[in-house]
Curated annotation (Swiss-Prot):
F-type ATPases have 2 components, CF(1) - the catalytic core - and CF(0) - the membrane proton channel. CF(1) has five subunits: alpha(3), beta(3), gamma(1), delta(1), epsilon(1). CF(0) has three main subunits: a, b and c. CDD domains: F1-ATPase_delta. Keywords: ATP synthesis, Cell inner membrane, Cell membrane, CF(1), Hydrogen ion transport, Ion transport, Membrane, Transport. HAMAP family: ATP_synth_epsil_bac. SUPFAM superfamilies: Epsilon subunit of F1F0-ATP synthase N-terminal domain (SSF51344). The keyword Ion transport applies. Disulfide bonds: none annotated. It comes from Afipia carboxidovorans (strain ATCC 49405 / DSM 1227 / KCTC 32145 / OM5). Its main location: membrane. The lineage of its organism: Bacteria, Pseudomonadati, Pseudomonadota, Alphaproteobacteria, Hyphomicrobiales. This is ATP synthase epsilon chain. Produces ATP from ADP in the presence of a proton gradient across the membrane.
Length: 136
């Protein structure tokens, strides 16, 4: 299978840089897969699980929003946060969800509350995926 260059960058680190076969990205407008020769695009990334395929093996990385750009050079994802599932502190992630739920009680109805609910929903989907697929 043809490969292309993929960079996953967060403010803290370069989480991944190398040749890959495929990357599945959690997009705001819907998830999308990128293969070698993909048409150029720019898309917003929602909190979710990004899947990198190398040599037929899949590496799962949690991203918490960001921006993806496909160009002739490959795919670059600028993520707000990027953490490999292998490195995830599941207890801290669960506490973060509990804190988000608690903070919802303090939000006034409106746009900010809607955003907080949507973000919490994304986090819960990630948590469900981790527990339902045995990634713990």
């Amino acid at each position: 299978m043809a490969t292309f260059h993929f960079d996953l960058v967060s403010p803290e680190k370069i989480a991944f840089s190398g040749e890959v076969e495929q990357v599945d990205v959690p997009g705001v407008e819907g998830d999308f897969g990128v293969l070698a020769g993909h048409s150029p695009l720019v898309a917003s990334v929602r909190p979710g699980i990004l899947t990198v395929t190398i040599g037929g093996k899949h590496e799962k990385i949690i991203v918490l929003g960001g921006l993806a750009e496909v160009s002739e050079k490959g795919l670059t994802v600028l993520a707000d946060t990027a953490t490999s599932l292998a490195d995830l502190d599941r207890a801290a992630f669960a506490r973060q969800i509990e804190e988000m739920e608690s903070n919802l009680k303090n939000e006034e109805p409106g746009n900010e509350l809607d955003k907080a609910i949507a973000r919490l929903d994304h986090f819960k989907v990630i948590q469900q995926h981790i527990t339902s697929t045995g990634m713990h």
